[in-house]
Amino acid sequence: NDLGRAQAEEAGRRLKTLIDPSTLPWVASPLSRTVETAQLARRAVDLPENDFVRDDRLKELAFGRWEGLTWKEVRQSDPQRAAQREKDKWLTVPPDGESYQLLSARLAPWLSSLSGDWVVVAHGGVARVLLHDLAGVSPHQAAEVDIWQGRVLVLEQGHHRWV
């Protein structure tokens, strides 16, 4: 929607206040909304909009049979597991889905393949895992972090901040 597009452009402009975005490699989830976000952010900083890597490992946390349901519908159809997830989002696995812990394991080979700084355009679940894996936020705190649209999450040297 228009708000999301404006937020993507704003994220690009905020990134430019931190670094020269042309000096870093960019990678994004291949899912359509992150590809569009990366394209808009790159356009906002005068970079070729399609010149970035798409990596399947950055796909959002899989909610399995809960995919497409509202939280109210999940609570009604699977009250026991919904209550379990409300208590422990990091470890609870939705039916045929993945927990944040499993997402962390999925991201581990990607993380170990990186060298240097990157611009990563991904999803909220991925950001929460990176907060834990790179910035040392506890698993339970990371799973509860609000992810801000239109802002840049900077992860460096074991710390994080929003710009």
For the regions a protein language model found, what residue spans apply to each?
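Active-site-proximal alpha-helix that buttresses catalytic centers in soluble enzyme cores
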Residues: N1-L47, S77, E98-Y100, S104
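Generic beta-sheet signal
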Residues: L24, S113-G125
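Short, well-ordered beta-to-alpha junction loops that form the rim of enzyme active sites
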Residues: A28-L31, R57, A122-G125
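Short, active-site-adjacent cap segments at secondary-structure transitions
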Residues: R33-V35, E60-L61, V126-V129
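Active-site signature of alpha/beta-hydrolase-fold catalytic machinery across serine-
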Residues: L40, V129-D133
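Phosphate-handling substructures
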Residues: R43-R106, E144, E156, V163
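Short glycine/proline-enriched coil/turn segments at helix->beta-strand junctions
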Residues: P48, S112-W118, Q157-H159
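Domain-level recognition of soluble alpha/beta enzyme cores
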Residues: L134-W162
